[in-house]
């Protein structure tokens, strides 16, 4: 019975990671496309998000190619998913396709009450030293509060 339930759990995990991958394709970012699915305790989708400019802000190719401009205003997929959720996220799980959460998003995740984060990094994504340091901070604070961060 346990192996059957374990297989079913893996099916759900893979299902939601694949959904996050599909949602990541909505991002217009030319270098990194990140997608998020937030799911409640009953495997119901609560919210989704992808990285991009705030609504109403022109996302022309010129602006998307301007790294300083893009970094200054882009909302991360985790932020968008949390902002668009219309219910309490306490106890929910977050699935991320692209990169694990940065330190700022980790802080938002902590405040939202999400309990587990599952992520998958595409093989073609390279992580800079700056981001590695930031991701290490994120992992530290998530571990400190007992949020599971699991690489799929």
Locate the predicted segments by residue.
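Zinc-dependent deaminase catalytic domain
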Residues: 1-152
């Amino acid at each position: 019975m346990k192996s059957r339930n374990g297989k079913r759990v893996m099916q759900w995990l893979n299902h939601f990671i694949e959904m996050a991958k599909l949602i990541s394709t909505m991002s217009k970012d030319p270098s990194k496309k990140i997608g998020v699915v937030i799911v409640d305790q009953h495997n119901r989708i609560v919210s989704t998000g992808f990285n991009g400019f705030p609504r109403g802000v022109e996302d022309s190719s010129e602006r998307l190619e301007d790294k300083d401009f893009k970094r200054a205003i882009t909302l991360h997929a985790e932020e968008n998913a949390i902002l668009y959720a219309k219910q309490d996220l306490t106890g929910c799980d977050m699935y991320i396709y692209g990169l694990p959460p940065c330190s700022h998003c980790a802080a938002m995740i902590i405040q939202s009450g999400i309990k587990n984060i599952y992520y998958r990094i595409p093989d073609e994504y390279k992580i800079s030293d700056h981001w590695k340091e930031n991701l290490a901070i994120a992992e530290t604070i998530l571990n400190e509060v007992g949020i599971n961060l699991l690489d799929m």
